[in-house]
Amino acid sequence: IYDTRRIRKGLPLKDPKTGLHYYTSGYDYTKMNNGYRGFQGDFMSNGIITPGREWTAKLTEVKYVYRDVNFESFYSRVLTLKNKCAFTNLADIYDLSYEVLRNGVSVEKNQVAIPSVLPGKTCDINIPYTTAVDDKAEYVITFSLVLKKATSWSKQGYEMAQQQFKLSAENVAGTSVADPTFVQKDHGKLPAIEEKGKLKVKDNTITGKDFSITFAEDGTLANWTYRNTQLVQPNAGPDFNGFRRIANDNVNLGATGGVAENENKEEGALTGKKMMVKAPKKQGKNVVVETAVTNGKDTHQIAYIIYPNGTVDMKVTTNNSSEETRKIGIAMQFAPGFENVEYYAKGPWSNYIDRQRGSLLGLYKTTVDGMFEEQSAPQTMGDRQGLRQLTLDNNSTKLQITTEGMVAFSLSHFDDAQFNYDVFYGGKHPYDLVRSNQIFAHFDFWQRGIGNRSCGGDSCLPQYMTPTGA
């Protein structure tokens, strides 16, 4: 939606303070409908591109759904394609290329010819990749169909469809990375940690070579420095966080899954009652700490193991009593300066448990600001599924996070609390948000499916509901 007063030469203007566009949405015109939100709100701003005609994560998913070819299977080096076109032979319009990735890094690329594939028919294509696949790394193969010739709407070589499959040393049928269950499967164990060196414990402070970690009395990780560099914002270590605000979530559920949206204060979703279960104590050469957060019926625990070399091992255990819970995970704030981001997960656009088929597993480089999504109505954003490894860099110090099990993450310079506003009558815009220097990070076991119904609630499918129990 454009406000014509904020357009110059056909382009939307930007706010000089934030650099963000002056986009408006249906929420800005509620008064024109006598104060009733019907057919205003996000009915007026929920397209698959932005008002400035820019690409979005939604468009990535829609492109996957509407493609005219199916990658049926990949087994024993044979790719099976199905032509979904009504009149066109695949061989007439597409070239096929493939790329092998080892832990997200490209190790082999090539191109093969597509045989004649009539409409509605399938074909088998031998893929002669030469990479030796072993159990020491994660291997996937990415297939891409690109245009043979330029068209009136696209250049030659434009990628029209893509699909990834996991490779294994056993040469069994490759699991499709597009399958939502892919990120729910175990992707490997954390490596063993060497225990060389010594640690000192005084009160709730653990000190090792070049680093220091302090816990508050309630179990909060209050301070973490490495070579005099602050890694975590003071008193903002890992804490339970179940908050999510998406404008078209079910109005009657709100962000927590149990409070009317226009009355939702969110305190219960943001944290709970904290406690130190086990104060810092030496265990061999290491130090162990256990903390917990109780939120209503649910208790969430973090068991820390701190090693002499500075590695911190966190085992997060959660308990959830409602499938309507919006998120199960932890939030924390990294210190200012760690702007450079490298992550091994599904990307490069944001993706969710029920909207990730168009996203590819890979090693991506970006910045925290680069992960911000300029949505017409500010809301929870930026999730990436299947996190394996994340590295934050402030140009002098690198902080690396490696995961085991199912983890999704997001990074932002904007506090989630800013999304806790009256969506329908608040009229907030991205340029209204206050940017902080620190980095707000989320690491989630599960985020409830976004759903896909424009009226009467989100209609989240059963398999994407938040699992209950421990």
Where are the model-predicted features located?
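Short, hydrophobic/aromatic beta-strand segments
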Residues: T88-L96, N110, S154-K155, E323-G329
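Surface beta-strand/loop "capping" patches
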Residues: W55-Y94, D179-G208, V316
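Intrinsically disordered, low-complexity Pro/Gly/Ser/Thr-rich segments with frequent PxxP/GP/PP motifs
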Residues: E99, N103-W153
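Edge beta-strands of extracellular beta-sandwich domains
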Residues: S152-F165
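Hydrophobic beta-strand positions in extracellular immunoglobulin-like domains
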Residues: L81-C85, V100, Y129, L145, ...
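Short beta-strand and strand-turn-strand segments in soluble, beta-rich domains
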Residues: D92, V100-V112, Y158-E159, G457-C460
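Extended substrate-binding grooves/exosites of carbohydrate-active enzymes
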Residues: I1-S76, K84-D92, S97-S106
